[in-house]
């Protein structure tokens, strides 16, 4: 519940009250003219209004377009990470992954156009995700879900160019600042413990944040330590299409099929449903149900030491470490044949009935459709650290020197990304229907999706991803206040950036799968498991998928074509690597 207050002001009453107070003050001054003035204690106002005032002060002090979020806002709103804190800035939109904000878009420009500085030093952090959310990040887009929002005291988005901000951003330059001991008055201890319960995953999600700070030697030396830890278990249930494609993408020209128009029979002639042959008709590529289970743990630690030998000089040493560990399981059941352009895919499908709306085949009943069930398992982690030292010295009342030097490193490891697929070929009576609710279509697979018998192993996909980003920064600046309305600033900056990316894949064709011990590729029933949707109306509720553990321990794992061994932890792979270094 947000705090609120109601006030009613009557101008006449307030005027009368102010006149009365003025008369009393005049009388008191006449009676106590010789008395010494009494100094009152300082009254500090905190709360939402105070945080807004601080943000406005930041905006007033900048010549460009700047928006800010300060500590009071960050701490009092339940933002799980930095992206969700930044989305409260006008013009900032976030993308989500696993139920959390991941990247930001500023004024329509995507993550690649936004540059991020932490304590004044440019940095980059990357994570992995499902293919539908962008997969492993090898771009310059910053993944904010590496960091808990509790670790930062100030977020600033600079939306316009400025001479004192180096180039590299068309969208915005986002400045993140961690807390420092001199931000607090003496000894400070703050703790925050929260928990939530997710009824979809049936799991508690604890969250803890703590900060301790103190200063000594009459405020000349200070130290601070903050820690944030959280756990999340989420379940996502839904549907997808993996885009829509032209029904005649493979342009077959066979004669019309009198039993029904198939994608291989799109030609002149009379048929029960000829409309599907139009070049302007689109069909879903992978109409499917989706179940995603995402578990993650995130730890963040900041430390800061400050030294102020005089009123004119301040040194600050800031340290930041964050680690996120995640495990994701994705299970799908889909019509795979609609995406195939070969003879065993779209060309063999026969369309029995359909409905076209606005150029889309929103309902179709088909024969000879391949049905696919797949199971994907990911394990990944990202470690980020940054160390920076900065100092400021006022040589005179009008001339100030400042400088900083630091380094940062983000290391993303995805040692396990394994996908197993199995198909049921040439299924009769398959249908999909997007007419009632395009977000909740109804699929009828023509077979019992929970029956583990008759599935053919079709794909074993084993991949590993590793991405490392490093920054080394240094700068020296000066500021000279020439007059009340004129300040001259300048400086020099050096930056070195290096990028290392590697992807390893299973040797050979991923669709070249070996036989089981039975002598064929039919998946044994005891090497399958069930996936269930809990709350998606109109879905089959449960379907069968490959079982990772059972298949990895079977004869398939030791006879996969092109490799001598594969498992969900250390697949035999071919590697590709890229390196980039930049100096500025």
Task: Set out the residue ranges of the language-model regions.
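N-terminal periplasmic "start-of-domain" segments of outer-membrane beta-barrel proteins
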Residues: 44-77, 103, 121-126, 130-136
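Residue-level detector of the transmembrane beta-barrel scaffold of outer-membrane proteins
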Residues: 115-117, 154, 188-192, 222-224, ...
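Outer-membrane beta-barrel translocator/receptor signature
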Residues: 134-142, 150-157, 164-260, 264, ...
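Outer-membrane beta-barrel transmembrane strands
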Residues: 172-178, 194-195, 204-215, 285-330, ...
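Cleavable N-terminal targeting peptides that direct proteins into the secretory/outer-membrane pathway or into
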Residues: 1-38
